[in-house]
């Protein structure tokens, strides 16, 4: 292992044991969704010495990303998120290998975007249907994947947990994903069985913005075509200390999986 690599990332071996850094250097992780959670996850993976990253997202940076997304800075607004994060990754590690896909994951492009086997997929996108299809696609192919639930509307990082997707609580989106996977993709209906998909979520109740400007735990009444979600201009509020904590919890689990001894 070259001297530069050891100087930059030697602390990883001193934490996980000799040889861990060499294994991470050989790993390939795909991050889907480079937003409030995904951008911080990419940062943590790059700083942990992961040698190859694939970044998938079609979004550009906007001013209202500033409260939660790592690359949202003056001079970067309007730039593709994957390009901004790629530049940052190369500054962290000039030898990192990057694959950039300026696309959103859809049921129709999973084979094209995820067809190359990787060591792990980290799902940080916020599209319900894409998450369902991606999890099902990965499980059919025995491709390890970590799913990230909703960080919006939450403020207490001590409530964040990592459990199998079949066991998550207090996350409406993950609950609906679980129902869809059982109903349409033949995931175990027996509640004693696990899905084999680690998920990051929070036990904290969601804080909803109200029409009068207050915030409380009561979901506001919406029109039939409206949906309350985390977005650039309205919907659920969010803060960096929570989106970042979700990301770091996901990367903590990723490190565990990537460094798990290989089965003979």
Regions found by a protein language model. Name each.
Residues 64-71, 154-164:
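Acidic/polar active-site rim loop that often engages polyanionic ligands
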Residues 2, 116-120, 125, 130-133, ...:
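Glycine-rich phosphate/adenylate-binding loop
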Residues 102-110:
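Conserved SAM/SAH-binding loop
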Residues 37:
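Hydrophobic/small residue at the entry helix of a nucleotide-binding pocket
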Residues 50-93:
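Glycine-rich phosphate-binding loop and adjoining beta1-alpha1-beta2 segment
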Residues 31-33, 56:
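Conserved N-terminal Rossmann-fold NAD(P)-binding element of oxidoreductases
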